[in-house]
Each structure stands twice: as C-alpha cells, then as structure tokens.
Amino acid sequence: MTKPIVAIVGRPNVGKSTIFNRIVGERVSIVEDTPGVTRDRIYSSGEWLTHDFNIIDTGGIEIGDAPFQTQIRAQAEIAIDEADVIIFMVNVREGLTQSDEMVAQILYKSKKPVVLAVNKVDNMEMRTDVYDFYSLGFGEPYPISGSHGLGLGDLLDAVVSHFGEEEEDPYDEDTIRLSIIGRPNVGKSSLVNAILGEDRVIVSNVAGTTRDAIDTEYSYDGQDYVLIDTAGMRKKGKVYESTEKYSVLRALKAIERSNVVLVVIDAEQGIIEQDKRVAGYAHEQGKAVVIVVNKWDTVEKDSKTMKKFEDEVRKEFQFLDYAQIAFVSAKERTRLRTLFPYINEASENHKKRVQSSTLNEVVTDAISMNPTPTDKGRRLNVFYATQVAIEPPTFVVFVNDVELMHFSYKRYLENQIRAAFGFEGTPIHIIARKRN
C-alpha cells in the first residue's frame, strides 16, 4: 500500500524546512536563514488524524550549478511529478514576489491539488497581509507560523481533504515484491534484464540513462514475484535528472512498496559511501534485504577471493549483518540461481511469527546465560516478551524500567532470538516497555 505523497514547494527562505520538521515531528533537515541551505533528509513520514502520508521538502533537492530560477522551476516540477498534494509556501514578511508568481504558473498546469500556505504569520496583526496572496489563484491562503507552530492544524486538514481512497493492493499477498536499489551504474537494469530473460529496460553505460520503469510480474520455480524496477529513477530530459537526492526519492518510494530489497553493489569498483547510504534507506524502512554483488565476472579470483569480498561487505555494512550476500554477473547471466533462495528465505522470515511460550523460553535462557545489567544498584528485570508485528518481526519486552535496558543488552537479546529462530534476511525490532 503506497501512502499519499505531499510536497512542500516554494522559493528559498520561505520556511519549507521548518514546516517539514514541524509536520514530521523531528528536526531532520538542517535549517538556517540563508537561502539554499537545506541539507540531509528531504523525505519523511507524517501523520494527521487518521491519515498517514509521506512528505517531501523539495528545497533539499539541489540542481548542481543551475541558475536560481532554474532551481526553483525544477523543484516545482519534481513536486508535480511525485506528489499527490502540493503545499505551496510563501512568506508574508516579504510579500508576493516574482518568484512566487513563477512557481504559481508552473503549479497551475499540474492539475494536482495545491494548498497555499502563508508562513511567518507570527501575530494577529499580520493576518490582514495574507489576503494579498489570493491573487495567486489557489483559493484561501492558510496563515501559519512555522517557528511557533501556529495554523498547522487547519493547513493539514486542508491537505488530507485531498487524499483519495486507499488503493487496493493489486497483488496477491503471497507474491514477493522486489525492489532493486543501488547507486548509478552498478548494473540494476542489467540485473532486471537477466532475471526476466529479456531486454525490457534500455541499458547504456552512462550512469542515470535508464528511463522510467513499471512493475513487472515474474514467476520462478512456482513463486510469484513483482519487480519494482527502481533503475528508472531518473527522468530523461529533465534539469534535475543528475541529482542524487532526486533518485533517492524515487528509490524510497519503491522501497516502501517492497517486501524484499536487493541492494546492488559493483564488485569491480568496490564499496563506497554512497552504497552504504542507499542500503541504509532499506534498513531504516525495516525491509528484508539481500546484498547482490554484481559484475563478479570482472574480478580476478582465487579460492579466497569470495571470502575476502564477503568479509569486506560485512565490515562496511555492519547494520545489514542479517542480510545474505549473492555474487552474480548480470551481464553474463551467471550465478543468478543463487539469488532466489535468499530472496524467498528473506521474505518468509520477514513474515515469520513465533509462539510466545517458545519466545519466553529463549529469553529466559538468554538471561540465565548473561544476567541483566544493573545501574546504580538497580537491576533490569525482564518479565516477559511477545511478538507484536511482522514485516519486520517486532517484539515487545516488558521490563521494570525502560532506562535500564541498555542498547548492548537489547542487541544481546536480538542475537539470542536470531540464534533460536533464524530470521536470516530480515531486521528484527525489539521494543522495551514498562510493565504496568
């Protein structure tokens, strides 16, 4: 199920990042007063009343050295392409500007719902200035103050009123939904072609040349799959096609729709920081993961080469210690059969449930082998544990004091649960909760 996407659009320094942070409830973008300083995360989850949605701060998407007006135009186009509802932000202190009118002209053509937010309305006297923005043609402007959190409720009421009915999932629940992610030119398109056995995706050697892709259904050895091909993250002919953050946005959307994510790395080039960033998105969303080392045919090998490379992967991707590693050559179509058992096992474990009685036996044994920690004379008491969710498997451990559950002991319990039940290919989450 894909959540609606809300994009915040506006010229620099109208307060997009401040509102973004208010809506998602945490400071995930760096905010300064100088135009163009938004960094870090541009995509997060929000909720209002009974509605869950994803939200984009387009100010975080930089278009290289493109001219100022081109940047604003590109950000508006990204919002039009990706969003279900657009929040168009202006700034009451600076009034209506030529840049605001330029963004409005682009948004008129979008045929997407646009909610006009007038920011920095920090007191009642400033509300009369809001009416100047009616001339933009988007109906009632909503006065808000990002710095004080005023007016956000009315703004979000207007935003969620444009959400349609939730779409039914078109695929059977036994169908494994696969997304394929990785930095440009690691061979994502070639891997899709190798799996499908046909040249469905146009492939060239220039990073970022793959056109938009659609879902493709596929069966192998009695199991149905849907490939959500994220190799087509970048749209050709657009000014923003070269921005890494835009391609990340497209990948995040695909990851959200997946059960299992194939993280593709290039055996020839080795592992770089961008690989870890891309893989981190799948981990953060709690998806099952298989690491695919592609272009294995290009590496000179002896009997120890694979083990050495695997050790390197484990060292660089410590947060993915649960993921299995497949070595393949998409171009030569070799070793692809090793992929599917890993995919199937990861998917199965992502949905695995364990009985509470068996789980508590494992936890009790773990505590007897390694007693719970103490802090200032107080010992952590673990009363019982239960599984509360799947995809990913999530366990609640009821304790006397949550503060006494140190990260290291939680990690120890996770390792013991994994040793008992497997869970290869999937993250598991452990939540400490105080017993009432």
UniProtKB/Swiss-Prot annotation:
It comes from the Bacteria. GTP 2 binds at residues 182-189, 229-233, 294-297. Residues 4-167, 176-351 form the EngA-type G domain. One of its GO terms (biological process) is ribosome biogenesis. Keywords: GTP-binding, Nucleotide-binding, Repeat, Ribosome biogenesis. It holds the Pfam family KH_dom-like. Residues 352-436 form the KH-like domain. GO terms for molecular function: GTP binding; ribosome binding. PANTHER family: GTPASE DER. Belongs to the TRAFAC class TrmE-Era-EngA-EngB-Septin-like GTPase superfamily. EngA (Der) GTPase family. GTPase that plays an essential role in the late steps of ribosome biogenesis. HAMAP family: GTPase_Der (MF_00195). NCBIfam families: GTPase_EngA (TIGR03594), small_GTP (TIGR00231). Associates with the 50S ribosomal subunit. This is GTPase Der. It comes from Staphylococcus aureus (strain NCTC 8325 / PS 47).
